[in-house]
Design a protein with these regions (language model features):
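Short secondary-structure junctions
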Residues: 25, 116-117, 166
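Residues at secondary-structure transition points
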Residues: 64-67, 147
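Acidic/histidine-enriched, beta-strand-rich ligand/metal-binding domains
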Residues: 32, 90-94, 101-105, 119, ...
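Single-pass alpha-helical transmembrane signal-anchor segments
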Residues: 39-49, 70-85
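N-terminal membrane-targeting/pre-transmembrane regions
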Residues: 1-63
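A membrane-cytosol interface segment of integral membrane proteins
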Residues: 129-168
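Acidic, Ser/Thr-rich low-complexity segments on the non-lumenal side of membrane proteins
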Residues: 92, 107-144
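Conserved beta-hairpin
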Residues: 74-110
Length: 168
């Protein structure tokens, strides 16, 4: 398969390739985990408060016991979904390529289609540069991780130097 065919094939089908080799690099964001914890505390506090106060005074509407438990129940559902979404992002790499798992999807890119990792100044997260000026945000590398993200980016760039094809 030529490089052009590989590029077209990988771009057209998100499940076109994957790697069976062991991963040499893996990164997640401790900052997003902290954001998730704070968000869940706020969501649950608001929903517990609403569940407690919904029936305190008579407003003309009938408020049943189930209504009082519905607010915290909705808060639990929102909290679980938030936790799953914010702790999901991950970046993995090996000699075959890079796997990016963001909030909504996972995608594998072979080294042949990657132009590098960049972290634009003022940006909240890094991104993988792709052909035709496209890029994929990498939620696993957040600027909120401060010194930790610098170490992770340097480690990733070491793999880039080892596996990315050289320009002709």
């Amino acid at each position: 398969m030529s490089e052009e065919q590989l590029l077209a094939y990988t771009s057209a089908d998100p499940f076109a390739q994957t790697s069976s080799k062991p991963w040499e690099y893996e990164a997640t964001s401790p900052y997003l985990r902290k954001v998730a914890i704070i968000w869940i505390i706020l969501v649950m506090a608001a929903h517990l408060f609403m569940g407690f106060t919904v029936g305190l005074s008579f407003t003309g509407a009938t408020v049943t016991t189930i209504d009082k438990f519905a607010f915290p129940g909705v808060g639990v559902v929102i909290s679980i979904l938030s936790w799953l979404a914010l702790t999901r992002p991950r970046l993995r790499a090996n000699s075959d390529g890079v796997e990016i798992r963001n909030i909504l999807g996972t995608r594998f890119y072979p080294w042949q289609v990657i132009y590098g990792l960049s972290f634009p100044e003022g940006s909240r997260m890094a991104r993988i540069e792709l052909p035709d000026f496209e890029y994929v945000p990498v939620w696993a590398l957040q600027s909120g991780d401060k010194q930790n993200v610098i170490t992770k980016v340097r480690s990733f760039r070491d793999l880039e130097a080892r596996y990315m094809p050289q320009d002709d």
